[in-house]
Structure formats: structure tokens, C-alpha cells
């Protein structure tokens, strides 16, 4: 299995180094749910600003403040502890009265607004995230500048970030032990983290191999394509390749790679043979996903950061802003720009 740091680059390995997360204010994330609170209902949506706190810790503290069970507080996604982040929490508090959440106090956390909402906020129920990153001590400004220009046009590999695999790859190691021993895992969180890490690692491997051996944006017979921003997909046939290639070049369509699991992967013929060969050595992880009935799915191989802009504060410091859809990783953008240094460069929740 290829480790995250050794995955194939789209734009070649960066020539320079830079410091990421010199302080939390250098990594700002603003969650975009894509909708506003209803203003009524048995749930309360709470927008918080946090610095140095992980999401679960804040959710548990909010539950304690509201005197409800921790499972009654949900969120759309985990946010980096070593960053300044805005996100929404959702608490189930039936009744007409809205508690005074301005009295909620937690070091490193501030309530920005809150309102009633009809539905529970579920994991993954967000549109995306806006990022503002500051890279410091950049050793090669020209290389970073050119890479930013290239990313605007060609995007980056849509890899799952290192944080998906746990600190030191612990989640992936857990999945491998589980696959090898077949010992039942009853902890729901461990099961979820380990299965997610296994499937994500296989996806990354397929994308890395395709980057190594072919133009990742070249449609081949049997590829599974999806409309940009949509989840559904269809299979490319030989007769359609020229027209489909035009639509891919126009960023109307995206070529996908497998998220392996039980059931059909989605590709056919040449594309299916390539995907199967790319992960042929990982029989244990594939068997684990099938055994645990994790359904196979598809994910775009390339990621195009939206609203990408940057500003050089000086020759060694650059502020970069962009928006990514839910499920995408800022670290997968940064790794195409620079070799990062810093204690928390690869760490997230």
C-alpha cells in the first residue's frame, strides 16, 4: 500500500518547503452547510467559532450545558483541532423556549448564532468548506506561484488526506489487523474509522497508479464518468470516447475511481481491469470491506479548488483562499504546492 506522502503527484513533487499551521490562525476553515436554519422545529442549529478544540469535545460540552445526552448533539463534519474553524452543531431540544446559548462558555469556543431547525444535522450534510491558509518560510516562491496557476487549470488529485488514516496511520493499521485476524470489532467508532480508512486507501492507490501510468484526465473504454458536482455516474463506451473526452476537457464531466466494497465497482472492460490490477495485492482489505457489507461507490479522481486566490505578503509568506466540496481535503491541495513542515502540518481530527 502506498503511504500518503508517497502518492503520485499530478504536478510533480514540489521543489520548495514551507511552514503550515505555524499557529492556528494560519489555518482557517468556515463550514458551508448550503442552507439556512428553518427558524422552527425541535432542533437548534448552533454556529460556533473554535480554536484549539476538537469537534466532539465541543459537542459534548454543549450537551452538558443543555442537560441532554451527548448523542442528542450532532454535526456535519469533524473540523481540525489545530485551526480556527467555524461550524454548526445541532442539538435536539424540543419545546417552545430556546435556551440562552450566549451563556455557554468553553475555553477556545464562542457561540456566534443559533436558531431553531426542523431536521437533525447529520454527518456529511454540508455543501463544503471555505479555507484560508497561510504558508510561511516558503523556500521557492516561483515554484509555488507556478503551481497555483497550474492548479487553477488542471486541479489536484482528489486523494483522501492523511488525517483519514489516523495519527501515524493508526486507522489503516487497525483495519489491516481486523482483516488479518477476523476478530469482531464491537466499538462502532473504531469500525467506522477503520472501514473508512481501508476504502480510502484503496481509492488513493487506484488514483496514484492511474497518474503513474496514464493521463488521469484521458477517458478510456469502460470508465465511469459523473457530471461535475453530482453523485450519479455512467459508463463510457468506445463509440462515445471522443465526445466524452471533449466534455471532460470542458470540466463538464469527471472521471471517477472506485471506492471498493461489496457489489459491482461500476467500471467495465479496460477501466475495470486497470482498477482491479491497481489494488490486486490488497486482498485482505478488499475482503474486509465485502465481509462487512460496505457498498462500493465512486469518487472523482480530480479535485478543482473553487474560488482559488492567493496573495503574497512578502517573498516567503503567502495567503491562499479556496472552497472545496464536502469530502475533499485541503491537505491534498497543499501537498501539490509545497513540502510542508511544522508540528501539525499533517494532523487533523
From Swiss-Prot:
Q: What is its EC number?
A: 5.4.99.27
**Pfam families, sorted:** TruD
Q: Which reaction does it catalyse?
A: uridine(13) in tRNA = pseudouridine(13) in tRNA
UniProt keyword tRNA processing present: yes
A single GO BP term for this record reads: tRNA pseudouridine synthesis
Keyword annotations for this protein, in alphabetical order, are: Isomerase, tRNA processing
Residues where substrate binds: 27, 129, 329
Q: Which InterPro entries match?
A: PsdUridine_synth_cat_dom_sf, PsdUridine_synth_TruD, PsdUridine_synth_TruD_CS, PsdUridine_synth_TruD_insert, TruD_catalytic, TruD_insert_sf, TruD_pseudoU_synthase
Q: Name one GO molecular function term.
A: RNA binding
The keyword Protease appears for this protein: no
Q: Which GO terms describe its cellular component?
A: cytosol
Active site positions, chain numbering: 80
TRUD domain sequence ranges? 155-303
Annotated function? Responsible for synthesis of pseudouridine from uracil-13 in transfer RNAs.
Q: Which HAMAP family match?
A: TruD
Q: Which NCBIfam families match?
A: PRK00984.1-4, tRNA_TruD_broad
Task: Name the protein family.
Answer: Belongs to the pseudouridine synthase TruD family.
The protein in question is named tRNA pseudouridine synthase D
- Provide the organism lineage as a comma list: Bacteria, Pseudomonadati, Pseudomonadota, Gammaproteobacteria, Enterobacterales
Whichever gene encodes this chain, its name is truD
